[in-house]
């Protein structure tokens, strides 16, 4: 869960 949140947060910023 935590890993998923952290993974999607920077993913949006990178996108």
Curated annotation (Swiss-Prot):
Record localization: Secreted, Cell wall
Which keywords does this Swiss-Prot/TrEMBL entry list? Answer: Cell wall, Secreted
Cellular component annotations (GO), alphabetically ordered = extracellular region
Judging by the UniProt lineage, the source's domain of life is Eukaryota
Task: Please tell me where this protein is predominantly located.
Answer: secreted
Q: Return the protein name.
A: 46 kDa cell wall protein
Q: Which organism is it from?
A: Daucus carota (Wild carrot)
């Amino acid at each position: 869960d935590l890993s998923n949140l952290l993974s999607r947060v920077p993913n949006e910023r990178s996108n």
